[in-house]
Amino acid sequence: MVSRLLERADVFVQNLAPGAAGRLGLDADTLRAGRPQLIVCDISGYGGTGPYRDKKAYDLLVQAEAGLVSITGTETESVKSSISVADIAAGMYAYSGVLTALFRRERTGSGATIEVSMLEALTEWMGFPLYYTTYGGSPPARSGARHAAIAPYGPFSGADGETVFLGLQNEREWVRFCEQVLQRPELAVDVRFESNAKRVEHRFALEAEINSVFGKLNVEEIIARLELAKIANARMNTVAQLADHPQLAARQRWREVSTSVGPLRATLPPATIDGVDARFDPIPDIGANTDSILEELGYSEKIVSAWREDGLI
């Protein structure tokens, strides 16, 4: 069946356990031997060579191997990312690699073998802390939701218990922040805070000054001041609040898709292409198209019925 599918396939993607594709005859060399135009993409934890080639990998484990967990969390505890960043990183590089190979095939007629390692994909995303550590001599400190090297940059609570994040990028913004947001212009010339390096050094004193002001304001009032001063900021939303985010609604980013359990909302793909409407066809149940696909592949009704009786489909 796989052979029949491959006869009309442009791309074959697999992320089976290490060595499984080869044992099944689905490795790139075997598949492309009679199909030089085929694009084969192998996704694995650590790649097909090297001492880790046979090592199993899951998202959290790769986060740990890539050093991400070591720099994420608080001073007292390392934590993982709450989304599957290693899986997503590998998937995105597989996606871009396949598109590149398809474009090249249009010009050359030749397929390609693509290898994507979860570790290598996440290592690419770890570029800043990796080079900061390699050439700066020490890794970025775990600082919770704060920025490790910029202050103030992180979360602050209002009198209503809500949280706002803000970040300053230069000294002009620092002066405006003191004058217009905190309404404490004397802090702009306080020697403890006269540069970003000083503000990081005296982070706790700085945050105490900010909290003394923000503790008397609700988050809406804080955001209003930040917006007026043109200081970057964001409200800390819950996932439920994200689902009802006014910006997503204003840009009409939600679509309704039909399913067997009724209509569900789904977001549009992030890349918006002028003149192209994303397809949101009804989502079929598992196995809903099995018969039509097998018929398309040339299997007789008798064979399909036998497979169904044997529980194969």
State where each predicted segment sits.
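A structured beta-alpha segment of the ubiquitous adenosine-cofactor-binding alpha/beta core
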Residues: 1-33, 215
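Non-transmembrane alpha-helical segments in soluble domains
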Residues: 3-6, 99, 174-179, 211, ...
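Residue-level signal for nonpolar/aromatic packing positions in well-ordered secondary structure
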Residues: 13, 31, 40, 59, ...
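Active-site-adjacent "lid/gating" segments in soluble enzymes
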Residues: 22-168, 176
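Aromatic-enriched alpha-helical interface/lid elements that frame and gate functional surfaces
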Residues: 152-229, 233
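Short linear loop/turn motifs
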Residues: 189-199, 236-244, 303-313
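A glycine-rich dinucleotide-binding beta-alpha-beta segment and adjacent secondary-structure elements
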Residues: 228-280
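Flexible, small-/acidic-enriched active-site or ligand-binding loops
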Residues: 259-308
